[in-house]
């Protein structure tokens, strides 16, 4: 059980879209999947926030420039339309919490506010996706 919790936690650092299916495949209880994914994802964005400006340089080296620009444009449209609140909540679902935090640091003036709203987005979407995934498995 501890091994499964650790696996879901560490995968949660990489993003919520990856750890929820892994937890469901390992037949873990949805509450534990949700808790460990939330803790892991929040730790992941905290690390990104603390490393700050070096993140964009890292992404531009290792990812295709067009991929970053496409995600930045999508993120910028989201930010212009909904502000930091919408960016944190909807960006978490659309492009994942790590990319939202990393790219959001380049356009948001207050990283702590972005961290807060991205954390809220992580809690909302992890809970929703875990419940829907569990519900889908229990139907079949």
What residues fall within each predicted segment?
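Transmembrane helix boundary and interhelical junction motifs in multipass membrane proteins
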Residues: 4, 10-22, 93-102
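Short amphipathic alpha-helical segments
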Residues: 84, 98-102, 115
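Alpha-helical transmembrane segments of multipass membrane proteins
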Residues: 15-18, 43-48, 99, 121-129, ...
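Transmembrane helix-bundle signature of multi-pass membrane transporters/permeases
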Residues: 8-13, 37-43, 118-123
């Amino acid at each position: 059980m501890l091994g499964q919790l650790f696996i879901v936690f560490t995968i949660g650092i990489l993003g919520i879209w990856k750890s929820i299916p892994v937890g469901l495949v390992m037949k873990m209880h949805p509450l534990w999947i949700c808790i460990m994914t939330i803790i892991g994802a929040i730790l992941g964005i905290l690390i990104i926030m603390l490393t700050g400006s070096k993140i964009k340089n890292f992404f531009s080296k290792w990812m295709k420039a067009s991929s970053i620009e496409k995600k930045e444009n999508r993120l910028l449209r989201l930010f212009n339309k909904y502000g930091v609140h919408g960016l944190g909540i909807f960006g978490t679902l659309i492009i994942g919490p790590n990319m939202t935090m990393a790219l959001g640091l380049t356009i948001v003036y207050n990283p702590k506010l972005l961290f807060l709203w991205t954390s809220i987005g992580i809690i909302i979407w992890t809970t929703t996706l875990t419940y829907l995934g569990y519900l889908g498995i229990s139907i079949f």
